[in-house]
Every structure is written in structure tokens, then in C-alpha cells.
A protein has these predicted regions:
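Structural motif
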Residues: 344, 478-480, 510
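Short periplasmic/luminal acceptor-recognition loop of GT-C membrane glycosyltransferases, typified by
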Residues: 27, 393-504
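Membrane-interfacial segments at transmembrane helix termini in multi-pass membrane proteins
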Residues: 371-385, 411
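N-terminal signal-anchor/signal peptide hydrophobic helix marking the start
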Residues: 17-18, 383-391
């Protein structure tokens, strides 16, 4: 088939200059403010892992604080290593790779929609919708794995959809499909393979037929491509670490994370059923229109089949086929693409908002289909959509200038460590009091005290602190303490303390032997 979805004629063509300006604005927005302090527990840890690999010139073994860190594959760390080499070790470099992956996701959406519909204007509108989607913008700005796996998954699905749109006449789209599955395996592990294969299987269930012969034959040379790409990291990791790698990375970080709440991220089954829609803002209304039309069409055809069916099994099967083959193949692929990650992560024992990001892409494509059709009929809707996209960018920029820096001051220890360094304490060890500060992983610059298992050491009492400073009488210690607990340190007669600074949430305290 030459195209796998159709649009009503009469849609206005948007000037080319507008799309060029919007693309430039998108690039600006996605890189703006990447120098802000690293936030949350994950960004500093992943940035520190990349730095340690960079400083050792080691592209294989991820470490945190010098201890093996087998939580995730290496793609994000590789991006950080390259960025550190170019820009130095800083926040911008840590986030540069994810920002590029965000732009890569948008470009993949454009290519997918362009080749699937032979309609460049629709492709432009789809890219606009993807670029201005809150979920994609937010996760493209963080040094984390969610957008890093979303890009190759999107590129892989683009390869398959382009292959379908060209009636399987070329092998290059399938080469891209298999290549980017390999990249996705390097980005976040086994879901890089499970999701594309699962999506294609579900899509063929929707259309009620087997994959074409050319695609099935391609598996014989496609899986070797996947293996070669993935083996660039998995093979040397196994050769270097053996069964330890298999146990920690495959068994614990994949199967135990999915089957249990070992990593303490529990949420109800329906968690992603409301997180996913929120991530599609500001295009949620158009996604709901698409979903509503699909449900109404399905119910209408079910009723029609029920009225004409003679009750036989053959009639029932034919009815299912009729229901499934009347809607756009692109729409069906997108629904399969949404459902596989949605159901997979809903069944998982561990749930974090970013997990569902791969499903945001097909959701916004479904919204873009409705937007393109409606804006072609109504100048008001056209202006409304353009205004919403630009307004989203304006809100993001204003937030990064006026809101996020104030929030970041209370959420990062960057300023606290900088104050201690400026006071001449830049070589002192750092530890937490009662609680650990994961934000310090990056900013403490290798000075964190650690337990034998590699975790940050936390002093549980003032007496324990006294034992440490007595043992190391010639060297003070920097303590990061929640502000409400600082009085336990300052009021104690067991140690000498000096509160260097606080950020409203955490204080950094110099602790000496009394």
C-alpha cells in the first residue's frame, strides 16, 4: 500500500518558513536551561556514573563511588562520556545526550508520518505536536534513561511503519528497525526488544492476519543485526564480570524489578492510565477525541455485525475482521504501540512516571491525526493549535528562568558543597546524617563516605559521629543534614560543629573532634 492512512482533502498548507522557524525554536527550547543544577536522586547518580567512566576512560563497566553499578545499560553513560569530552564535566554535558534523543524522537515522528502518509504537511504538524508535548519536553531535559530508550524505540517503529507503507519493497527500513532495536537494548535492557516485537504481534492481531513473508524472512538476518549492536556492550560486560553481571543486571534489575517491589516504587495498577494522558498535555483533548471515535466506531460495527450475523463461528470471525480492517493501519499500529508499554508497566511491581514515556509518542501521533484533520476544516482550531504549541514553549522557558531555579535551590546541594569548597574544605569527606543525599553523588565529587556494599554511609547518631571524628582526629568531616535535625548536632557536647550554609531543606555542617 502506498500510504497507510488517509486524510480528507482541503487541508491548508502551512508555509515552509514557519516550519523552519518552529524547528529552530524547538532546538533552542530543548537545550535552554540545561545548565541548571541536577535534580532528584537519579540525575546526579547517572551523571556521576558517566563521569567515573569518563575519568577512567572505561566504556564498559559502570561504577558509582568506585563500586560496580549494574542498574542500567551503558548508552546514557556513553552519551555523557562524549559530552564530557566536548563540554567538560558539568550539568549541560550530562543532559546533552538526552536532549539530542528528544530531538531524535521528534525527527523520527516526522519521518514516520511523512513516509506513512506521503503528506509532508501532516508530518510537520505531527512533529509540532510531539515537540510541544509536556512529557517529551520534560524528560528530554533530564540526565535519565527514559528519553534515551524512547528515541530508538520510536526510530525502530518508524522503520517498521515505513516498511509497511512501501509494501515491503525495500529492505533499508527493516535494517533500521533491527538496528534501533539493538540500540534500545543498549539504552534500557530487554524492553528494547520486547516492546517492538510485542507491538508488531498485537498489530497483526488487530488486522487479523500473519506478517508478510518478506518480514518473516527478514528475521533470519535481522536478529543478527540486533545481536551485533547489543553485543558491543553486553559481550564485554559478560566477559569481564561473568555471572555477577547476569545476576545483578538481568535477574535483579529486570525480573525482580518487574515481579516485586524490591526497589520501593509501588503504585496501583491504574497508575499509568492517568500518568500517560497527563504527559500528552496540551494535546490531551485531541487524544480523547481519537479514543472516543475509535470506541464509537467499534461499538457501531459490533452492532452492525450482530444484526447481520447468522450466529455461526465463521460469521463471528468475519465480523471481527470487518471491524478491524476499516480503520487506518497507522491508527492500529499506534494503538498497539500505546497498549504494549501501558499494559507491561501496569503489571510491573515497580512504577515510576518516566517508564511510560515510550507510549507517549504513539499517543501524540493519534492526537496529531485529529489535529491535522480539524485544523484543515477550521481556521480557529488551526490558530488555537499553533497558539498552544508556542504557549507551551513560552511557559517552559519562563519556568526555567523564574520558577525552576528557586525550586532547585532547595532540592540540590550544589550550593552547599560550593560554599564548603570556597571555605577551604574541598578535600574533606562528606556524609549524611540520618538520611543520605543522593544529590551529593555528583556534587561531592568522589568524597562521599561509603559502606562496604557501596551505599552512601549515613551516621545514625551523634555518638556514631563522635567515634568517627575521634578516630580521624586530624581531619574534620562535612555532614549533610536535614534542617530539622541540625539541632541534634549543634546542641551536642560530644562534637564541635559549624553550620556553613543551608538551602532551606538541608544544611552542610563542619564536624570536628571536641
Amino acid at each position: 500500500m502506498a500510504e497507510i492512512t488517509k486524510f480528507e482533502p482541503g487541508a491548508q498548507q502551512t508555509p515552509r518558513w514557519f516550519w523552519l522557524v518552529f524547528f529552530a525554536l524547538t532546538v533552542f527550547v530543548y537545550f535552554f536551561g540545561l545548565t541548571l543544577p541536577l535534580l532528584g536522586p537519579d540525575e546526579p547518580r547517572y551523571a556521576e556514573v558517566g563521569r567515573e567512566m569518563f575519568l577512567r576512560n572505561d566504556w564498559i563497566t559502570p561504577t558509582l563511588g568506585g563500586f560496580n553499578w549494574f542498574e542500567k545499560p551503558a548508552l546514557l553513560y556513553w552519551l555523557e562520556i562524549v559530552s564530557y569530552q566536548i563540554f567538560g564535566v558539568n550539568e549541560f554535558a550530562a543532559r546533552c545526550g538526552p536532549a539530542l534523543c528528544g530531538l531524535g524522537t521528534i525527527i523520527s515522528v516526522w519521518l514516520l508520518c511523512r513516509k506513512a502518509t506521503s503528506n509532508s504537511d501532516f508530518a510537520n504538524w505531527s512533529a509540532l505536536v510531539a515537540a510541544s508535548t509536556v512529557g517529551i519536553i520534560a524528560f528530554s531535559r533530564g540526565a535519565s534513561f527514559d528519553i534515551v530508550v524512547t528515541f530508538p524505540l520510536t526510530a525502530a517503529m518508524a522503520g517498521f511503519i515505513i516498511y509497511r507503507a512501501r509494501d515491503g519493497s525495500r529492505s533499508l527500513p527493516l535494517v533500521c528497525f533491527y538496528f534501533f532495536i539493538g540500540v534500545a537494548l543498549l539504552a534500557k535492557g530487554l524492553i528494547g526488544l520486547l516492546f517492538p516485537i510485542g507491538i508488531i504481534i498485537l498489530y497483526h492481531v488487530f488486522v487479523w492476519r500473519l506478517p508478510d513473508k518478506r518480514f518473516l524472512l527478514s528475521l533470519s538476518w535481522g536478529f543478527p543485526i540486533i545481536l551485533v549492536v547489543a553485543a558491543s556492550w553486553y559481550l564485554p560486560m559478560y566477559l569481564r564480570h561473568g555471572e555477577t553481571f547476569i545476576d545483578e543486571f538481568i535477574i535483579q534489575q529486570h525480573f525482580q524489578r518487574f515481579l516485586s517491589n524490591k526497589y520501593q516504587h509501588p503504585q496501583p495498577f491504574i497508575f499509568f492510565f492517568w500518568v500517560l494522558p497527563l504527559m500528552t498535555i496540551p494535546w490531551l483533548p485531541f487524544l480523547l477525541i481519537s479514543l472516543g471515535q475509535t470506541i464509537r466506531g467499534f461499538v457501531k460495527r459490533i452492532r452492525k455485525v450482530s444484526e447481520t450475523s447468522d450466529g455461526s463461528l465463521k460469521a463471528s470471525v468475519d465480523g471481527v475482521v470487518e471491524i478491524q480492517t476499516r480503520s487506518s493501519p497507522l491508527v492500529k499500529i499506534c494503538y498497539a504501540w500505546v497498549l504494549i508499554p501501558l499494559l507491561f508497566f501496569s503489571l510491573s511491581g515497580s512504577k515510576l512516571p518516566g517508564y511510560i514515556l515510550p507510549a507517549v509518542v504513539p499517543a501524540v501521533i493519534l492526537a496529531a491525526i485529529q489535529i491535522y484533520r480539524l485544523q484543515g476544516k477550521s481556521e480557529t482550531i488551526r490558530r488555537l493549535v499553533l497558539t498552544a504549541a508556542i504557549a507551551t514553549f513560552v511557559v517552559v522557558i519562563c519556568s526555567l528562568i523564574f520558577v525552576v531555579p528557586r525550586f532547585a535551590r532547595h532540592e540540590t546541594v550544589k550550593g552547599l558543597i560550593a560554599t564548603a569548597n570556597a571555605d577551604g574544605y574541598n578535600d574533606l569527606p562528606v556524609a549524611g546524617f540520618i538520611v543520605a543525599s543522593h544529590n551529593a553523588e555528583f556534587y561531592a565529587d568522589g568524597r562521599l563516605l561509603r559502606d562496604s556494599d557501596g551505599r552512601q554511609h549515613r551516621f545514625g547518631s551523634v555518638s556514631e559521629l563522635k567515634e568517627y571524628v575521634d578516630l580521624h582526629s586530624d581531619r574534620p568531616l562535612l555532614i549533610l543534614s536535614p534542617l530539622e535535625l541540625v539541632h541534634h548536632l549543634t546542641n551536642s557536647e560530644l562534637i564541635r560543629t559549624d553550620v556553613l550554609e543551608d538551602n532551606g531543606e538541608v544544611a552542610i555542617v563542619l564536624v570536628r573532634r571536641r
